[in-house]
């Protein structure tokens, strides 16, 4: 289902864009990097998997729900096969609306595409994965924490996503947020 034109995006969690990125740190090693970006607060959740299937996308959805300090109401994805079957079912079970973009329209998922660029430039440019998925995800989790809690964002008037939420949407911060990392 495409996002209705009148669907209002006003607070964190109204729409979270989700996408994958192919990583080839060196010959013979391949990872799928999943990124979720909240379009209002720029809060990111990132995780790497060995491949991108609907089972991994479902697992990533669980990571997203666990690591956001606000309820996720809707996710927006491209039409990739990883966002079908088990992922669609998981969205329905969690009560999360699923919006699927038309084919070949990455500009409509621009926030998460920009997030990929930031993670490539600021994380992967300085951290070289060794081929160990567990180690990569441990380091990605540390980077995610820095990104959401320490790194200022120009788009948020130099606030961090956490500061932005606390300042503009204080009622959304859930009690689980202190246990996220």
Where are these regions (language model features)?
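C-terminal domain-tail junction helix/linker
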Residues: 1-8, 12-14, 85, 94, ...
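Mobile-element integrase/transposase regions
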Residues: 1-37, 56-59, 70, 177-181
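Acidic/histidine-rich, metal-coordinating catalytic segments
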Residues: 52, 70-85, 104, 157-162
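Residues immediately flanking
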Residues: 20, 39, 51, 79, ...
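RNase H-like polynucleotidyl transferase catalytic core
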Residues: 74-79, 93-111, 127-132
């Amino acid at each position: 289902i495409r996002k209705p034109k009148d669907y209002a995006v006003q607070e964190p969690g109204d729409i979270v864009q989700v996408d994958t990125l192919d990583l080839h740190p060196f010959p013979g090693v391949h990872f799928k990097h999943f990124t979720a970006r909240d379009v209002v607060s720029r809060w990111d959740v990132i995780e790497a998997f060995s491949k991108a299937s609907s089972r991994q996308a479902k697992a990533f959805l669980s990571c997203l729900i666990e690591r956001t300090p606000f309820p996720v109401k809707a996710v927006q994805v491209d039409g990739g096969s990883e966002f079908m079957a088990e992922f669609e079912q998981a969205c329905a079970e969690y009560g999360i609306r699923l919006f699927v973009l038309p084919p070949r329209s990455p500009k409509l998922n621009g926030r998460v595409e920009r997030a990929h660029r930031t993670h490539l430039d600021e994380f992967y440019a300085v951290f070289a994965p060794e081929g160990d998925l567990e180690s990569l995800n441990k380091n990605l989790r540390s980077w995610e924490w820095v990104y959401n809690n320490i790194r200022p964002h120009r788009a948020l008037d130099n606030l961090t996503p956490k500061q932005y939420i606390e300042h503009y949407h204080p009622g959304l911060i859930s009690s689980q947020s202190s246990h996220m990392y």
